[in-house]
UniProtKB/Swiss-Prot annotation:
Keywords from the named record: Electron transport, Heme, Iron, Membrane, Metal-binding, Mitochondrion, Mitochondrion inner membrane, Respiratory chain, Transmembrane, Transmembrane helix, Transport, Ubiquinone
Remaining remarks: Heme 1 (or BL or b562) is low-potential and absorbs at about 562 nm, and heme 2 (or BH or b566) is high-potential and absorbs at about 566 nm.
Entry binding sites for heme b b566: 97, 196
Locations listed in the record: Mitochondrion inner membrane
Topology within the bilayer: Multi-pass membrane protein
UniProt-listed PANTHER family: CYTOCHROME B
Iron found in the keyword field: yes
GO CC term, one of those recorded: mitochondrial inner membrane
Record protein name field: Cytochrome b
Domain of life: Eukaryota
Pfam families: Cytochrom_B_C (PF00032), Cytochrome_B (PF00033)
Gene: MT-CYB
Amino acid sequence: MTNIRKSHPIIKIINHSFIDLPTPSNISSWWNFGSLLGVCLALQIITGLFLAMHYTADTTTAFSSVTHICRDVNYGWLIRYAHANGASIFFIFLYFHIGRGIYYGSYTFMETWNIGVILLFTVMATAFMGYVLPWGQMSFWGATVITNLLSAIPYIGPTLVEWIWGGFSVDKATLTRFFAFHFVLPFIITAMVMIHLLFLHETGSNNPSGLNSDSDKIPFHPYYTIKDILGLLFMLFALMMLILFSPDLLGDPDNYTPANPLNTPPHIKPEWYFLFAYAILRSIPNKLGGVLALMFSILILMLFPTLHMSKQRSMSFRPLSQCLLWILVANLIILTWIGGQPVEHPFITIGQLASISYFCIILIIMPTISFMENKLLKW
């Protein structure tokens, strides 16, 4: 008699994806982030569902409904802070996951990589709309500033902005539609994650050496299930420390003031995980130029497979490229810091230099260094 997990139509799919999946024997903890992102997504959907049961998407009551969740709902404070800080953890893991893909050359799986970049855009859009929902000062002004960027699109821009707003300013209609989109997008993300996995399982996982590992595979369960559970425990520990000891560490104090269209906060800025892109946007004095740079700062990820000039897939044996990648990471940290600073000297200049170096490293220096390393191989 055949084992049910190998014969049942649905269990068979789960078996081929998470149990009997042939996996390279040498993948490191950097490969944990995929499963951790899946857990984060599930956590966000569950906490979000419970928040939606008590939240009201109306400009007059949105702020007080969030206060009500924190004060009156059983463990409402825990659900709300798990959702808010869960988003931060989600983005940390997302950036680690992308960084690992760049370091080990996983972007050579074109379909998996491209759907991953589209996923990143969708997650960013979802997080932005979620930030608007508490209807605090930073929610309102963040929504106003970011949606206004679309007015830079020639000819149709201003009409498009009013269409998204549902009026002549960010108001009740905007909040209602943002709530609707924020609710539905995570389910679309879940479907896209399944496509992401489908493409990945067509080729199999990459590994730290960047070499073909068909001759050395082990079953996913129990080896990597136990490894993923260890990563999960670390994640839950970090998340609970954040929620229980400093839940507002990554938030903005301005968002504890109800939205007021007549009073602009001194420094309008998005959540910390968007600051690097925000710094690139602000570093260009032209509106359309800034918007294009903002879009391209993420879209540039799609060029990685094209810009790969090295004869080796992974950076494991390429010290020059390794150094360059860590310079890029430092550059992104500088951009994140600049994004949270006021628009004044010397921050403007630092932001412009960091933005130029961000694009130069990826578009010019990385391919050049790869080409040099190819020459060095012949020595």
